[in-house]
């Protein structure tokens, strides 16, 4: 059975390491903030100038002036800091962010990423995605395995405008987790009840299964 959006976010939260500086992309990746594992202290950064994002606020905690880059209201943890977008992008471009968890429309088995534009459709635009994939130390994609019409999102080549070439390190979907390697995709984990036959049918490229040592 496919993971729910919250289960996907919880799985992505397992990628977080203690003391890391992390940027969460708009959309599904923002849910990761609600699933940070106990004992893991991370600093979540947003392009609009906030370091130290906390979980999403409850109804009595909403501050309309405190938002992330996707214009969602957020909370700030103790020790959070606020600054201009020029400083925020300097952190990103300077290689000071350890991990970015981003959404995607298409990804290839070589780690190419398309996540900012669909021709003919209104989308929020590029935002900081190109800066993130160029400057962050590790990039994880969090997305549904296939599009709403059932077409593949993991492909040999993106047909949407690219955000970056060879930039993705790991892909987490509602069905599985893949590592992007020089030899292509390696299946690391599958959601409970999801078999290889289903994965191969819903993945637009070949992959190998990680061997357990």
UniProtKB/Swiss-Prot annotation:
Heterodimer of a subunit A and a subunit B. PROSITE patterns: COA_TRANSF_2. This is Succinyl-CoA:3-ketoacid coenzyme A transferase subunit B. Keywords: Lipopolysaccharide biosynthesis, Transferase. It catalyses: a 3-oxo acid + succinyl-CoA = a 3-oxoacyl-CoA + succinate. GO terms for molecular function: succinyl-CoA:3-oxo-acid CoA-transferase activity. Pathway: Bacterial outer membrane biogenesis; lipopolysaccharide biosynthesis. Disulfide bonds: none annotated. The keyword Transferase applies. The active site is at residue 47. The keyword Transferase applies. SUPFAM superfamilies: NagB/RpiA/CoA transferase-like. Its EC number is 2.8.3.5. InterPro entries: 3-oxoacid_CoA-transf_B (IPR012791), CoA_trans_fam_I (IPR004165), CoA_transf_AS (IPR004164), NagB/RpiA_transferase-like (IPR037171). SMART domains: CoA_trans. Belongs to the 3-oxoacid CoA-transferase subunit B family. The gene is lpsJ. It is an enzyme of class 2 (transferase). GO terms for biological process: lipopolysaccharide biosynthetic process.
């Amino acid at each position: 059975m496919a993971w729910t959006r919250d289960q996907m976010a919880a799985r992505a939260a397992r990628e977080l390491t203690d003391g890391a500086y992390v940027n969460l992309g708009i959309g599904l990746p923002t849910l990761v903030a609600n699933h940070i594992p106990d004992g893991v202290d991370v600093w979540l950064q947003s392009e609009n100038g906030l370091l130290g994002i906390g979980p999403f606020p409850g109804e009595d905690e909403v501050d309309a002036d405190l938002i992330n880059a996707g214009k969602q209201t957020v909370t700030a943890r103790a020790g959070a800091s606020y600054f201009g977008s020029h400083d925020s992008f300097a952190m990103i471009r300077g290689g000071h962010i350890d991990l970015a968890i981003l959404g995607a429309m298409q990804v290839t088995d070589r780690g190419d990423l398309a996540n900012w534009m669909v021709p003919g459709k209104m989308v929020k635009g590029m935002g900081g995605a190109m800066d993130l994939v160029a400057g962050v130390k590790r990039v994880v994609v969090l997305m549904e395995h296939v599009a709403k019409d059932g077409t593949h999102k993991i492909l040999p080549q993106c047909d949407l405008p690219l955000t970056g070439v060879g930039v993705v390190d790991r892909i987490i979907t509602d069905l599985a987790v893949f590592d992007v390697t020089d030899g292509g995709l390696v299946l690391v984990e599958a959601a409970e009840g999801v078999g290889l036959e289903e994965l191969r049918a819903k993945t637009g490229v070949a992959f190998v299964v990680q061997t357990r040592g």
